[in-house]
Amino acid sequence: MQSRLLLLGAPGGHGGPASRRMRLLLRQVVQRRPGGDRQRPEVRLLHAGSGADTGDTVNIGDVSYKLKIPKNPELVPQNYISDSLAQSVVQHLRWIMQKDLLGQDVFLIGPPGPLRRSIAMQYLELTKREVEYIALSRDTTETDLKQRREIRAGTAFYIDQCAVRAATEGRTLILEGLEKAERNVLPVLNNLLENREMQLEDGRFLMSAERYDKLLRDHTKKELDSWKIVRVSENFRVIALGLPVPRYSGNPLDPPLRSRFQARDIYYLPFKDQLKLLYSIGANVSAEKVSQLLSFATTLCSQESSTLGLPDFPLDSLAAAVQILDSFPMMPIKHAIQWLYPYSILLGHEGKMAVEGVLKRFELQDSGSSLLPKEIVKVEKMMENHVSQASVTIRIADKEVTIKVPAGTRLLSQPCASDRFIQTLSHKQLQAEMMQSHMVKDICLIGGKGCGKTVIAKNFADTLGYNIEPIMLYQDMTARDLLQQRYTLPNGDTAWRSSPLVNAALEGKLVLLDGIHRVNAGTLAVLQRLIHDRELSLYDGSRLLREDRYMRLKEELQLSDEQLQKRSIFPIHPSFRIIALAEPPVIGSTAHQWLGPEFLTMFFFHYMKPLVKSEEIQVIKEKVPNVPQEALDKLLSFTHKLRETQDPTAQSLAASLSTRQLLRISRRLSQYPNENLHSAVTKACLSRFLPSLARSALEKNLADATIEINTDDNLEPELKDYKCEVTSGTLRIGAVSAPIYNAHEKMKVPDVLFYDNIQHVIVMEDMLKDFLLGEHLLLVGNQGVGKNKIVDRFLHLLNRPREYIQLHRDTTVQTLTLQPSVKDGLIVYEDSPLVKAVKLGHILVVDEADKAPTNVTCILKTLVENGEMILADGRRIVANSANVNGRENVVVIHPDFRMIVLANRPGFPFLGNDFFGTLGDIFSCHAVDNPKPHSELEMLRQYGPNVPEPILQKLVAAFGELRSLADQGIINYPYSTREVVNIVKHLQKFPTEGLSSVVRNVFDFDSYNNDMREILINTLHKYGIPIGAKPTSVQLAKELTLPEQTFMGYWTIGQARSGMQKLLCPVETHHIDIKGPALINIQEYPIERHEERSLNFTEECASWRIPLDEINIICDIATSHENEQNTLYVVTCNPASLYFMNMTGKSGFFVDFFDIFPRTANGVWHPFVTVAPLGSPLKGQVVLHEQQSNVILLLDTTGRALHRLILPSEKFTSKKPFWWNKEEAETYKMCKEFSHKNWLVFYKEKGNSLTVLDVLEGRTHTISLPINLKTVFLVAEDKWLLVESKTNQKYLLTKPAHIESEGSGVCQLYVLKEEPPSTGFGVTQETEFSIPHKISSDQLSSEHLSSAVEQKIASPNRILSDEKNYATIVVGFPDLMSPSEVYSWKRPSSLHKRSGTDTSFYRGKKKRGTPKQSNCVTLLDTNQVVRILPPGEVPLKDIYPKDVTPPQTSGYIEVTDLQSKKLRYIPIPRSESLSPYTTWLSTISDTDALLAEWDKSGVVTVDMGGHIRLWETGLERLQRSLMEWRNMIGQDDRNMQITINRDSGEDVSSPKHGKEDPDNMPHVGGNTWAGGTGGRDTAGLGGKGGPYRLDAGHTVYQVSQAEKDAVPEEVKRAAREMGQRAFQQRLKEIQMSEYDAATYERFSGAVRRQVHSLRIILDNLQAKGKERQWLRHQATGELDDAKIIDGLTGEKAIYKRRGELEPQLGSPQQKPKRLRLVVDVSGSMYRFNRMDGRLERTMEAVCMVMEAFENYEEKFQYDIVGHSGDGYNIGLVPMNKIPKDNKQRLEILKTMHAHSQFCMSGDHTLEGTEHAIKEIVKEEADEYFVIVLSDANLSRYGIHPAKFAQILTRDPQVNAFAIFIGSLGDQATRLQRTLPAGRSFVAMDTKDIPQILQQIFTSTMLSSV
């Protein structure tokens, strides 16, 4: 209905100033309108007769309202009505007036923005009504609405709050933000709204006016007052303002509440009205631009755009934007739009495209960057009616524009004056833009963390002369914290203290709201009115008004400032401005979308782009002038490469390399120029604790940026450098020194038991460097690595007092800073350690920082960064004392104050919060790791000085391995030094306890987790900690008795038959011809050494493998013993190569000689290489000799040089035999008995000369002989035993000690005769000469000799062994010329005789001669001869009992012990693989193992599969080892006293299931109930003899061990059968055959461990997601510190308790994560499965996914598809049909197998990946994962890897990973290089596939939950 506006002024009316203003106002309204337009609604003001109180009437159209004169005119809104009211607003006002006349309450509903509020205020201004305004937030409670208690003079009073005041005084109550209030708070008002009645806390009762007036007729006012009845004014009205909730977030309206309001939709102003308004503002802007701008904005507010998920455009900010454009008409509009609506950081890709489309549609795209503001040119101060302003000149394009902006009270500084601020181009531009916004509105600055927002804001404030008020916001901040807090006055009265924000508003400061993205939107709502209207109502009833409104009020009421302040009305300073700082919203995530439609209306947004590289270099260079240039360039190109990658992993790494962090690194580099950049970066990223994916991505990127680990830093630095020392007031740690602090408070300096070790000293040195640079430190590490100890030691050395504070779950911001407590009714604050440390300059140690919620620890940021912090009692901490000048309540930070924060590493299994992620970049981070083995050993020695060294070494090694398993994620618990130290302390105190029982103190935690237990036991066994062994499990070889010795006769020297005494042999001397050196590559490989005595004690004490090719053949081994180091050399001959290793070390080395030994021309060439290690001074050099080609090589293993030595005899060797000559190839031999003395002897078989090679002198001596040689034994240095080839006649060659070059020394050859004992008649029995296999080159000691031949004797002797005798001793040989006696222990039958027949069939031809290796050693120190025999030569019947089948072996070690006259046969386990060349093998040795001496009392064997084993054979040594071993196990079987074991004495009958108890009561013992605990025979937990475990959920009572052991066998068997039956039953239920069950078990069992650990992590996630929160304002629970005062006043709801937090209002449903596994089921998988089992591994991986995610469907939804030649989308597991049991899972595995068997060939990896990525995003989910398994031979199908890389990263929402199953050659690794880091894996070994999957899950999926 159209109405007319009339203006009728009664002449001479005295309506007072108010009515005069109203008339003027209405007159203006009318004058603006063109006359004669009669279709408009009108507002009229009518006067009644002169002087009447309620004289004036307001008419809006046909609705009129009588004005009343307000009692408190200062409460009437001022200055809200604008000159020209838009038609739509007039319509709204008319409607409100109608409702007002009806006495109804109204609800103005509509989109966010100030419009609804301003309409309400305009109405109230028009009708002269007093207003009570309350902004509801989630912190509003009943007391804020009704009555609050205050204490006055020791008595609690009730003070009426807004609703009650409004009702009694007849004001209008405006409730803003109903959707913000928590549920069930507002119903308090229901009755007041409906019946105008309310019961108050103080006993009064509000009653509606009509009823009150009725009562008043019958009763007097006095009576009613005595009944405490109060009249509600008939003028009381409520206006509620709210958002429509389904569209915006918030709590929906309560139906009873809703029904009490009349609603009116207040949408944005209509297009025309809005356009008119904008035209009036922006006179300089072309009309076309304005209308385009408005059209754009209106489009984005339409229904369609909200269905796209775009937030509403803030239409209300348009006026401000047009105001800027009015001053800068040349500025592109698109640019201004970005400020109002920062769509580029707010929206995902699709949203951006939509907005860009609308921009194009309205031709707003033309943003020439040349028209953007460039910089601020100058700033001048000016005063305009007492308001300080600045005129700022901004250069835009090439014009300069001057604008007026509000300024602060301090002096202005020119834009580039600050020395701490470095101007870069983008920053200048940003400042200019901020200046433009500052002209009209508050600013919100958005930028990543550490990019300099605070610095920019501060510089901006300096430029305009503002004082800054930084306010750090945190997550659980309440509205009270923002506005006013309660405190007590000294007399005990309660009062309100204004917050810094309110003070700043009054004083005209610039407020920095730091971290506005953290605060709950419901809390920020209280600031809306301050930001939009510059008005604020506080809790204590005071009101802050905008300055012009305040002035108007002052002038109208003719009051002074003091009088207004008495009425608690204050002006807001016109210069007051807010700058909010925030981190960009997380695009696409539901949880972190703080930038909503409501927020958009409050600020102008400026995005602070990360610095570009050149600018960042400029900043760093100017801040740190002498930073090394090269390092800086590398660092920045690396960082920017990370920042530009889309990959989330790279992004998170880049986040920890913020500008702030780069500056820190640069400062350190400039201070310590030889620092290593690699370690600086890894330290900043804390790479030690990154998930494995992120770590590998970081390593890859570092390698690409050529940032290497310094190789010249030797891994173990010089030990002498690293120590801490204090000299004359200076502390030196390593290379860094610092002055020692002079502490006042000595008792606060920590003093701690600390044993220095190198690694901790290095950490402390590193800390000291940063400490001296003024950094605050953050130490991150696993538990028990000594973080606290290091810090205490560090402070002790520096002599700094420390304050200690430990955080935990319930730490709040208040408890961090102050502890409030009540004393005598006053509230008193006690300083927390933090404040004390700040005041006194102590070091604050914050322990367990990751346990507190991150929203609490955030407040440390401003303290560390800016040195500012506000305390709960109103004091503030400031950094520089210059700012203090006379302000009270200020604490200045002491210059010596520092913070050291300790936290556990982020991520599983530590259930802390990610402290490092949120605050890592403001501290200097140090990763503290467990000490390296030798540091740890050093430390443990000090903890356990009496603990035997080997035990410490074992512990260190075993724990080292466990830690590396924890790093790989195979086990969850990271074992730390703390655990080892505890073990060592125990052993130190109780030395008799066995190690294996003491380690259980640590490992019993894991005893119920079978997978974990298995890993632990294996690891401990590997290092020889015999956990689980019993003292009785000793399994030494059985001893057989040696036959009696027999006297064999004499060896006599000389007296040749011909009568010749001796033969002389001439000698020639030559120099060696040396070729070379050639540098040779020596590869290192790790040794996995297993201590073998884990479960039982045997002769074998350790073993390890060398990485041998399957076809390779070991042909010789040798050991060298140099100063305590035993080195083992192993030579192989196909191809020729050498392995050598220190027998105690961690790594071995490998040299390949394939291309060095010459291949001879004849077809079949079987090289045979022997090795001789040389001794000191040629330590580390070895001589290698090939027997057929007689090539001699000298290899220097330390210098990596190879020489070839050419002997003179070689120069004229006979013609080479070709394959058609059937003659035998020649064989050359090397005698190496004295190689440790650096000389060797070479001879040719059947040759007649010997060549002595003296390596040290570089000479050879050739001795010519009159005989042809068969073998040579060097029995002493100067006496050699020779055997002639045809007759086996022995000779003794003596040579002078040193053959001189003159040739004077001549060698003499004697015949050696073996004479049998004389039979008395001169008849000698003929003996066949046997060739010894081995003759010792030294003699037995005389005790050994005496006990061997059983007569006291001292004489030279040699011990030898041959095929007929176990051992032979020759007494007197070789030094005495008299006949030597020969004693033998004869074998029952000769060796090698039997083997001739039975091997001839399966080894091909008959054996040619004897094998080349005799495998025989003499151990003189233990009086033993040791050799290896094939099983056929061993008396197995004597060793093993009848019914035992002998094990498969590589051979037996035969130990002939002449001391105890015993024989032992020790089996060598058979080798895992054998070379297929069996004939070749048989020429080398007749067993599959070779033997050498290990040390004085043991031997080493190497089998043909490359397995090296160390054996102890000496009896004394074995006895000693057995003692140690028994000590390690401890005496578990000692009987303890005071134990009373009550045996129940009952027998066990047959097992049964037992009765099920209907009430499920716990049953203990008895013999009846099923599911009981601890009974016998019935199924249950922990009983004896029960059939299977049945858990009814009660505590378990254990039957004592002895009783368990007493269960008879047949009962056990029955129990097992019953268990079997239950299993059968389960199979039957899911219809699975046993064969199927076994098949499934094959796949499932292989991944059980991974499934298990994944499920543990998933469970923890579930738990973490379900973590309870603190619920405030509770009536029961723990006292909430923030509400102590409310408690004093006697309020009820002052407690807090833990509870499930309601999901935040309007926050969307948590969606599950989506995973799609794309597996390769192509034909090649089936085809190559035989080679590497890839198909089975893939099936295992699928099985793992299905099992791990079972029952987590609401968190993770997965489906599995396959790709093959048949297609790219073969459904295996659809999302809605997840397999439920093993049978269904097996079906899926079978399908995979069958598919790959029968599908077409071809490859659809790319299509499959692309399709999966496209499809998966179609459904909404929290996160998307696509994992592709493929054996893609990409090049074969012509697919370019770059194409694949592009597909993997095509959608930033999807985390896509590819796992390639190792294909041919290095193809897979090449592929990985082209694919993005951390996104692709190569599983060369298919066993890794499940492992890799597990890695992906743990490091990505779980990181973000």
Curated annotation (Swiss-Prot):
Cellular component GO terms held in the UniProt record: cytoplasm; mitochondrion; peroxisome
Domain VWFA residues, every copy: 1714-1896
GO MF: ATP binding; ATP hydrolysis activity
Source organism's superkingdom? Eukaryota
* UniProt-listed CDD domains: vWA_F11C1-5a_type
Gene3D superfamilies recorded = P-loop containing nucleotide triphosphate hydrolases, von Willebrand factor, type A domain
Biased composition annotated in UniProt, kind: Basic and acidic residues: 1543-1560
- Matching InterPro entries: AAA+_ATPase, ATPase_dyneun-rel_AAA, P-loop_NTPase, VWA8, VWF_A, vWFA_dom_sf
> Which SUPFAM superfamilies does the record associate with it?
P-loop containing nucleoside triphosphate hydrolases (SSF52540), vWA-like (SSF53300)
Give yes or no: UniProt keyword Thylakoid.
no
Q: In which tissues is it expressed?
A: In fetal eye, it is highly expressed in the retina while expression is low in the cornea, sclera and lens.
Where are the glycosylation sites?
A: 284, 855, 1096, 1142, 1833
Q: Fill in the transit peptide range.
A: 1-28
Which residues lie within the region annotated Interaction with PEX7?
A: 1-261
Indicate which residues the UniProt annotation says bind ATP: 447-454
Q: Which residues form a coiled coil?
A: none
PROSITE patterns, A to Z: VWFA
Disease tied to this entry: Retinitis pigmentosa 97: An autosomal dominant form of retinitis pigmentosa, a retinal dystrophy belonging to the group of pigmentary retinopathies. Retinitis pigmentosa is characterized by retinal pigment deposits visible on fundus examination and primary loss of rod photoreceptor cells followed by secondary loss of cone photoreceptors. Patients typically have night vision blindness and loss of midperipheral visual field. RP97 is characterized by onset of night blindness and visual field defects in the first decade of life.
What biological function has been recorded for the protein in this entry? Exhibits ATPase activity in vitro.
Which PANTHER family does this entry report, sorted A to Z?
Answer: VON WILLEBRAND FACTOR A DOMAIN-CONTAINING PROTEIN 8
Name of the featured protein: von Willebrand factor A domain-containing protein 8
Organism source for this protein? Homo sapiens (Human)
